[in-house]
Design a protein with these regions (language model features):
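Intrinsically disordered, low-complexity regulatory regions
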Residues: 1-90
Length: 90
């Protein structure tokens, strides 16, 4: 895949498609567990992921070997969407 030759809209569609696949898999495993603590709970998970991404990029430290920066950013994408879903339900 040569993302440089794609326009940004196509790139966004690919990122969102990948994130949706990830959300679908995790939602099958965890259900709506993210809703248990509401928006605040999701924001706390976002903070965890931000700290993780900073650790990976600034220090080169990746304690979870099967989750790199791309995986962490996809999780951030999904957590932001989950927070929006909860806000929309209010």
């Amino acid at each position: 895949m040569d993302c440089i030759k794609m326009n940004r809209v196509e790139q966004m569609k690919m990122v969102q498609g990948t994130a949706l696949e990830l959300f679908t898999r995790k939602n099958a495993d965890y259900g709506d567990a993210f809703a248990k603590y509401g928006v605040i709970g999701v924001l706390m998970r976002i903070e965890d992921k931000i700290q993780r991404s900073l650790s990976i990029t600034k220090n080169g430290v990746n304690l979870v070997s099967d989750e790199g920066i791309r995986d962490t950013l996809l999780d951030l994408h999904n957590y932001a969407a989950m927070a929006l879903m909860l806000i929309d339900e209010e």
